Swiss-Prot record:
Belongs to the CDC45 family. Residues 136-163 are annotated as: Disordered. GO terms for biological process: DNA replication checkpoint signaling; DNA replication initiation; double-strand break repair via break-induced replication; mitotic DNA replication preinitiation complex assembly. Residues 153-162 have a biased composition (Basic and acidic residues). GO terms for molecular function: chromatin binding; DNA replication origin binding; single-stranded DNA binding. Changing P463L: In MGORS7; likely pathogenic. Required for initiation of chromosomal DNA replication. Core component of CDC45-MCM-GINS (CMG) helicase, the molecular machine that unwinds template DNA during replication, and around which the replisome is built. Changing P496L: In MGORS7; uncertain significance. InterPro entries: CDC45 (IPR003874). PANTHER family: CDC45-RELATED PROTEIN (PTHR10507), CELL DIVISION CONTROL PROTEIN 45 HOMOLOG (PTHR10507:SF0). This is Cell division control protein 45 homolog. It is linked to Meier-Gorlin syndrome 7: A form of Meier-Gorlin syndrome, a syndrome characterized by bilateral microtia, aplasia/hypoplasia of the patellae, and severe intrauterine and postnatal growth retardation with short stature and poor weight gain. Additional clinical findings include anomalies of cranial sutures, microcephaly, apparently low-set and simple ears, microstomia, full lips, highly arched or cleft palate, micrognathia, genitourinary tract anomalies, and various skeletal anomalies.
Amino acid sequence: MFVSDFRKEFYEVVQSQRVLLFVASDVDALCACKILQALFQCDHVQYTLVPVSGWQELETAFLEHKEQFHYFILINCGANVDLLDILQPDEDTIFFVCDTHRPVNVVNVYNDTQIKLLIKQDDDLEVPAYEDIFRDEEEDEEHSGNDSDGSEPSEKRTRLEEEIVEQTMRRRQRREWEARRRDILFDYEQYEYHGTSSAMVMFELAWMLSKDLNDMLWWAIVGLTDQWVQDKITQMKYVTDVGVLQRHVSRHNHRNEDEENTLSVDCTRISFEYDLRLVLYQHWSLHDSLCNTSYTAARFKLWSVHGQKRLQEFLADMGLPLKQVKQKFQAMDISLKENLREMIEESANKFGMKDMRVQTFSIHFGFKHKFLASDVVFATMSLMESPEKDGSGTDHFIQALDSLSRSNLDKLYHGLELAKKQLRATQQTIASCLCTNLVISQGPFLYCSLMEGTPDVMLFSRPASLSLLSKHLLKSFVCSTKNRRCKLLPLVMAAPLSMEHGTVTVVGIPPETDSSDRKNFFGRAFEKAAESTSSRMLHNHFDLSVIELKAEDRSKFLDALISLLS
């Protein structure tokens, strides 16, 4: 059931209990977790934190802890499946679910006792009505008894005939109801998409409790920015939510201009920015940022000689010396940096890039450290998905979580360096895929497979990294192809996962169009294709459009997917 009063029905309930937090491995979930941890610390709530990267880890962790806890909080996992069916909990177990995955499973919506959904109902949820999908068994058993009073045989016969007609009618009505139910559920469940950021939901709770701090507001901003960076929400949804957070930023960071000089070394200041759509440019060189931002790399077609030439023309149009552009942004001449945003935007317009600036936020820690929200997203994501062998997935999760605190800026800077490697590898892989024609049309969708032995292939074995690569590859392919039909197709991409087990990670990405509603139909399609071919598939990831597949089943799985979507 949906929780309408978060304070009374959620926070005041868990405040006096020991609770277990299951947190998914994505940046928005980490930010929501940080806000909740700060609230729990404030009120001395006892909790245990368990990171989970997929359904298997969630099931294992729940079995391990279910005897010690009655209250479980799930962040960015659990809403889009029948949770009680998967976890088989005791009847006194309560789950509070704060999750962006949509659609919300109907059993979770209509369970009043054990499932409590911490989800904003002003999101466009479109949940089917209870009577359209659930039917009481008593209805079907009614009138099934046959009264044997002392009536005349002719009366009994007439009544029996009436009952037979009535039962036939009821059976037909039930068949019609079941057919209608299947249609309703198919329409409701066929597309996967994302709702309001969980970090924003948790920040609103903190605000309701009058315990919202600037740090919490920053985490909410990073959570929303994570959704935008990963194309999980539409541009309109992003701009709307930026507007909501901007009001809180004004409230928390309201300063008179003459107060600027009195800022202390340890202050934290958040600002609304209309900044450049260039990744990590303030921590990199402008040239590296232009080459490794998917928006500019795709528009310039930087994988080609002609594209490189266009980039040089772009820099010449701005009048920026190559020496300045190729050195660290911090070392550029101050006179050039002053009007840099306007110069880049003006030249970008001439080169057909109308969206070079974007609404975002930045944070200052004291005088020295400044980060854009997207900088923090890329750094945190890279720490979490790090291919470094010096720690487990849990270690990487904790490192990523720690990097969100201002007391651990060294970890954040380390994350920025990892992010640069990941972004370079992404653009190099895209160039390789396009130059060797690895993106092929399979009819109803485009398909690309990274082979074992491809440079940096292990960087893309993790779901978030592969999803981001796929989205950037599709953007670049749409800019490079002259085939109009191919521009409108979705993309399926595969990358090696484990040589030992002979498995691949497969992701499905919806078509790249300006009007895209970011809804993804591949989750259900993958399920049906695997069922019809008995392919050995594991739906372990919380995003249904990401699966693990046995490499030897790949060709029959793809054939089934082609016939299903044709």
